[in-house]
């Protein structure tokens, strides 16, 4: 759902764009609509997430959908050569899997080679906000994401 857009999202989109000519991103309004208890409700509005995706140079088009039924309709009405998913879906059933298989749409499962996630970001913000209240800021929270690390990765 691209909630709390972060470096991991950008890294994933960059890898996906390297494997295709035109990258279409499907953005779900709220995954809890038809999967309550399974997915988290987004912190950011669909508009905020849309604007963030729109600002990412790797994204060519964004299609917004509400339900899993809407997603399968999007998959069926778009001309797709490849569908990207997180590696966590590799051995599971998911919306549109059989349709993609039956219609020779390649399923590409990308590996997460980093620690960035929306959950990690929420936890980091929570930790820092709590630390402000108690005036105890753990150094490792800052060290892990220090500007000095940028120099190491800017060249790649």
What is each residue range found by the language model?
Residues 1-156:
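Nucleotidyltransferase catalytic core that binds NTPs
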